[in-house]
Amino acid sequence: METLDDLFRRLEQLNDIGASLSNERNLQLLLEKILLAAKTITRADGGTLYLLSKDKQHLHFEILRTDSLHLAFGGSSGQPSSGKFPDLPLYKNDGSPNNSMVAAYTALTGHTVNIADAYMAEGFDFSGTRQFDERTGYRSQSFLTVPMKNHENVIIGVLQLINAISPESGVVDFSQADQRLAESLASQAAIALSNRQLVQQLEVLFESFIKLINLAIDEKSPYTGGHCQRVPELTMMLAEAVNATTTGPLADFTLTEKDRYELRIAALLHDCGKVTTPVHVVDKATKLQTIFDRIDLIDTRFEVLKRDAEVRQWRAIADGQNQPQAQGIYQAFCRQCDDDRVFLRQVNLGGERMRDEDIERTKRIASQYRWRNVAGEDVPFLSDNEVENLTILHGTLTSAERETINHHIVATIRMLEALPWPRHLQNVTEYAGGHHERMDGKGYPKSLKRGDMSWQARMIGIADIFEALTAKDRPYKDGMKLSQALTILENFKNNSHIDPDLHAVFLQSEVYRRYAAAFLEPQQVDC
């Protein structure tokens, strides 16, 4: 007979278990803890934990343990329960309740079933249990089947325990104390499980909302949508490499699961402010592009100039000018127009740094030709805005457009600061908002220096740069070779743009190789 001290000890175990369950974040480990705790406080040899399926038609095997047979499935066992055992139907083919199966009966009625000997029990079908015993040599005797009801009194699963063990007499019945303790644990476990599932559902909803923002950016511009997806992957690759570092200045850096989740969320949101950036600036593939590429307008103007020149040629001939001479002037003009058009088309691409002589030639073209616009006005061939764009030194963006692009990080910070972050995500804004800062304080928007920034913000900064260098879906360039990207990243380190210690881990742990294998084209991987 159980002593009062034994009962108090088991009650203390129950209290300790309740606290432990509330702290477990991993769903499979939580389920395992529930079953192992139930086995411990009832001294059961075996047990199974079922969860109700989403359609409420089946019980799904989640965790199974039988100590004397050394059977372990699900949880941390390394043996998945999925597919090992068939789901237990709650209803028969005719739609009637499957009350002959004890676990199904408990799930349908919410009643605990305490059976002293399955072989002697009436009203339940234990043929499957007998077959299991015949195959394994086991003897399933006492059964305790308990519903798991959450805080809304909704059944979400079933806890089934087998063969209570007495140190003196072996297999015994589950006592009333066992039953009450198991029912109390099942109630606590169901609430902890519901809370964990609710948190997971909220996390899934939150991440889905983040992905919705990235999808909006993707719909605006396919050139940045891929960026929003790849930067988090590269960030986490680098973070795991840093976490594994055991020497140097990063030896003490560690990541918990909460830290990983917080960093991933920050990386997913690092460019959310781009929803405010005009699409024609984000997608500006050439210097003259706005909603369309204005180089086509310049082509048309050249054709107008050549047409006007042809008209002048025939008028000159009609006025008595020597025909070969008039034709020579016309043809020379057309050749000059064609040559200047080819030049402007090349300049418009913005692929190379603009030379001083090319800038002068562009300005000369702008002033040497005159044409009549649709209003009949005689105007310079190129407008001031077109000259400004065509003489951009490098790339395709003017200073104003670059400022517009850079403003996205300000928008990102404002958007993230407006959210009521829970404690475990309180650093998201700092992580996401710092990826354009530099180690020397010359970055933006806050001109932070290395010591002002977290390691995580610096990780996102490296991931952001390396992804942009190697991206194959940008409008203004093809995907860069891996060796060239690494050389440029080295220059960024030497110029105090990125963190040198993180850069060292990036190289030594060959993070770039894992990223290249997952995201780069084979022709880009040249080292």
What are these regions (language model features)?
Residues M1-K33, K39-I41, H60-I63, L198-L212, ...:
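Signal-transmission linkers at sensory-effector interfaces
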Residues H70-R139, N373, T391-I392, T398-S399, ...:
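Regulatory sensory and allosteric helical modules in signal-transduction proteins
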Residues D173-A177, I213, D283-V311, E386-L416, ...:
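Divalent-cation-assisted or electrostatically stabilized phosphate/pyrophosphate-binding catalytic cores
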Residues M1-D6, F126, E134, R139, ...:
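Regulatory loop-to-helix N-cap segments in sensory/regulatory domains
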Residues T48-P97, M120-A121, L268, L288, ...:
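GAF sensory/regulatory domain recognition
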Residues Q141-E152, G157:
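A short, aliphatic-rich beta-strand micro-motif
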